[in-house]
């Protein structure tokens, strides 16, 4: 689950694999760490992507001063967190990729991940939306109480599109786990993922596998695309598997030549019978012959000229049908505005300060007194905690001094 979550945020087909894969490992490591710590400290309710983002920004950009063999060294705070974890920790293993990287390579990994998850720091609406949970995915499969979850994704804010793909991925995985509790590993109620503008959604991890095995668990996908090129662009080689595992094809209209050719081919051919005649130009026809040939049921060029309100459906193991449909706006169904729907979202009033994980508890364990080989006692504290610095300075005996460093303050006293 955590691996697929990391894939949603870091997948990038345009860059070299090392950067998204390294960024994914770093993100997975931080998620696993905060989950483990949240469980141990009783703060699981505060584990969210907003907390992950703040953990990364705060600890990834600050250094602490450590004494190693009598020498002061700047050590990244994020490195210190994972170094302190016990051997065999899943979070520590996932962090190894970025731990091994140095210099510009390490900076590029950190920059890549910072860009991938920046939405949780720059978009307060998303931070609040993901700060808690009001949805029990298992209720979607309750045959006695039908339920639908409607996602409203603003087309003008592409940065928010990743949330829709993330929701679909997590919902699918949760329902698969729930299906395993039933005989035959099949949900008691069908669940449809109706994904409008599927071609514009951020890639959903393992989509080809989901659509292949999902039907056996009563998990069905309805994918709406403008043309098949969108599918090929997004999913590359997996696009063919996705297409071939759709049991129903519904064609409304397209001007894309390749899409029309594919659909015309999927509809199949029809057989026509015709007669040919031969003979001299100025005499009676002396020969005639009958023959048969196959032609497309509907030619690609005819598909693009279908009248408005017409649709062609090809169902698996059935002959295609030509039908008509009524546009939604003619059905007289009242639609709610986004503002009306938002009134039911309790999380929009959440204070982010109350939902963030208590990161100070992590800082307190990182900065501990250290004694060097000359007897000097050191204690590092963050510069943004002036009250703590003053308190520690007053606690030390006469002659203690404070050295101000770029990131933190190092307090030391003579032996």
Where does each model-flagged region fall?
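P-loop NTPase motor domains
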Residues: 1-219, 234, 244, 301-322, ...
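Conserved ATP-driven motor cores of ASCE-family P-loop NTPases powering translocation/secretion/packaging/pilus
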Residues: 211-312
């Amino acid at each position: 689950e955590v691996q697929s979550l990391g894939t949603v945020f870091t997948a990038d087909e345009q860059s070299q694999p090392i950067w998204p894969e390294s960024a994914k490992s770093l993100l997975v490591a931080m998620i696993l760490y905060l989950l483990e710590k949240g469980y141990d400290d009783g703060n699981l309710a505060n584990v969210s992507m907003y907390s992950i983002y703040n953990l990364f920004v705060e600890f990834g950009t600050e250094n602490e001063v450590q004494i190693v063999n009598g020498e002061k060294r700047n050590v990244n705070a994020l490195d210190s967190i994972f170094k302190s974890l016990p051997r065999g920790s899943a979070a520590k293993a996932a962090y190894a990729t970025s731990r091994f990287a140095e210099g510009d390579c390490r900076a590029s990994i950190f920059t890549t991940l910072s860009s991938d998850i920046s939405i949780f720091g720059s978009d307060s609406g998303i931070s609040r939306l993901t700060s808690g949970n009001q949805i029990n995915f298992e209720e979607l499969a309750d045959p006695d109480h039908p339920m639908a979850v409607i996602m409203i994704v603003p087309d003008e804010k592409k940065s928010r599109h990743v949330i829709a793909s993330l929701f679909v991925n997590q919902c699918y995985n949760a329902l698969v786990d729930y299906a395993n509790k039933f005989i035959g590993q099949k949900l008691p109620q069908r669940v449809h993922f109706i994904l409008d503008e599927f071609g514009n959604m951020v890639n959903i991890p393992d989509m080809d596998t989901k659509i292949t095995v999902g039907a056996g668990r009563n998990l069905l996908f309805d994918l709406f695309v403008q043309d098949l090129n969108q599918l090929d662009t997004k999913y590359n080689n997996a696009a063919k598997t996705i297409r071939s595992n759709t049991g129903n094809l519904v064609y409304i209209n397209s001007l894309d030549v390749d899409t029309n050719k594919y659909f015309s081919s999927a509809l199949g051919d029809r057989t026509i019978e015709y007669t040919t005649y031969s003979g001299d130009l100025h005499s009676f026809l002396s020969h005639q012959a009958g023959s048969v040939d196959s032609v497309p049921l509907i030619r690609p060029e005819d598909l693009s000229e279908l009248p408005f309100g017409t649709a062609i459906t090809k169902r698996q193991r059935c002959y295609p049908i030509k039908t008509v449909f009524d546009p939604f706006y003619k059905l007289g169904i009242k639609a709610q505005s986004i503002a009306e729907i938002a009134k039911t979202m309790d999380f929009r009033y959440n204070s982010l300060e109350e939902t963030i994980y208590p990161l100070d508890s992590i800082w307190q364990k990182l900065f501990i007194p250290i004694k060097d080989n000359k007897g000097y006692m050191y204690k590092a504290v963050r510069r943004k905690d002036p009250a703590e610095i003053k308190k520690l300075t007053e606690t030390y005996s006469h002659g203690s001094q404070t050295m101000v460093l770029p990131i933190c303050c190092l307090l030391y006293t003579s032996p």
